């Protein structure tokens, strides 16, 4: 009816977010859990906490990769940032699972390069918020990585 079916990335997960999403709203899932969202969360965290972090040395050039690299090195600030990111995503996935009841949840895109530590963290929050019968749904990484959308689009063209 409105062309918005499947736009789950624009479900509001943080109504207090001040930054505006590209859709015009605030606190959308995509805004909070994309690579740029992780950068925004990192900058916000570092500005409001005194936690020592290797990320501080990067100044404005923080990237999602830098956050995940710092996490692997045991950086406490990176851990807090990834926990916040994972809570947003895990909670949203728990809501979506109530609607679509998936056999498996596949995480893709640039952030999926963080690997198993990321899916473990997302799974923790997913299980915290999921409807009891959905709690065992596994969360895995997309095997096609960031190219999954390209393969899917090509498949649709070939199929039609």
Question: Where do the model's predicted regions map?
Answer:
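ATP-binding/phosphotransfer module of carbohydrate and carboxylate kinases, centering on a glycine-rich
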Residues: 15-20, 25-160
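Short, intrinsically disordered, charge-biased short linear motifs at domain edges
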Residues: 5-14
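Short Gly/Pro-enriched turn/cap motifs at secondary-structure boundaries
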Residues: 1-2
